[in-house]
From Swiss-Prot:
Keywords per UniProt: Capsid protein, Virion
Name this polypeptide is given: Major capsid protein
GO terms for MF: structural molecule activity
Taxonomic classification: Viruses, Varidnaviria, Bamfordvirae, Nucleocytoviricota, Megaviricetes
Gene: MCP
Location of the protein in the cell: Virion
Pfam families xref list: Capsid_N, Capsid_NCLDV
Amino acid sequence: MTSNPETPVVSNVTLSELRSDVNKRGTIDSYIYGPDEQVTTYFVREIRPCAAFSKMPVLLNTGNGSNKFGGTFTMPINASGDYLLALTAYISISAGKLRSYAAGTESSYFPKLAHKLIKSVRLKVDAKPLVELSSNFMDTWSEFMIDGGNYEAYTNMVGGDFQYSRSVDIGAKTLVLPIPLYFSRDSGVALPIGMMVNNRVTVEFVFRKLSDLLIKENVPDTGAGTGFMNMLTDGDFATPPEITKFEVVADFAVVTDFEIDRTSCSPHYILMEKPTDIAATEILKPTEAGSTLSYDIEHSSGILKALFFGVRNITHSEYLDYYEVGLPKSNNGVRSIGVSALSKIGIKCGDRYRVPMLPAEHFVFTEPYRAACRVPTRNRGQYMYSFALDLKTVDPKGSINPSNFNSSISVVIEPSEALRNSAETFEFTAIALTSYILYIDNGSLKKIDNGGDFN
């Protein structure tokens, strides 16, 4: 037996090789999938009869623009397979060193750093956004839709909690961000990129500046601290952190020739989900107990599946995801916990309550328990209401179409006593999760209600 000192060159499997494997049928395959002519799925739907397919991860590491702090980076997604299943970003940030350190101060990146670093992700078709996921959406979605068994691991993947440094050193970071695109939850609505021969598909990442991500707080060894001091900037560093690696893995599916032929014969209809961030509105605090405030939810046409909303504390707007009354401070080394900003919440369609005024806890505990994947351990001021029976599935069952009854949607809130008496500043934020129908016709992707314009 001889040894070969040379490192073997391992090539990636090709599309044609993978399709050849998928087309092969053995005895067990016939029992699992049945004959091709009996498969009526448009691709593959979880826990339902499905066509044969094989998954193929592809590394995306080239693009246009800047994949550094404050930059915008666009990566092409070529048709390396028949369907796009998922996207995951891998990010490395180098260590940094401050010019000086003062006793009684601590520095840290914000929690879930990957959500904060990437201000938005836009999946585009012919330069028009098909889906845009904001930093706010990723934070909120993870709070309710990452199940309890995976929540801790997911939080660590995307950057962990506050990790304070009491020195001039800021540690390096390795981040993994599974991008929560709707089709990553159900391959039955995977993006049929192989059929979109007339479209150009890209993914665009917008990065926040370093000065938006690193915070300094006053945390004395004993006694109460004053909390927020300032954000760290490049000028505070002898060696500023840098993004040293940014890569994306795209998971594709390769299906059989029969599946491709069948879906090429007629228009191909697919359900999609799209979150829309509603413009934030500063809250004018009422002085009387029981007073309510109403906020319109302006969203584009589509089936309304769920609402996510909250009252963000913007006294120090540098805190990107703080939704409580009472700014965070340290007392004898323990970080303070704020209190809820709301007492009751209702949802109106037109001039009638679709959801009556209910205790705020209904929207942070009961609703997630019934319809989502995770119930927050305490009321952190982020709320949800799902019109659909099961928010995790892409099935829109229970969703409403406000245009059918020509009504607007609004969220009505009753501020808590703590908010009414607080000198702090707040804003109302909301995200509408809506469903649409896409279709493929003659090699082009279009949205059925909007003539191909994905905005």
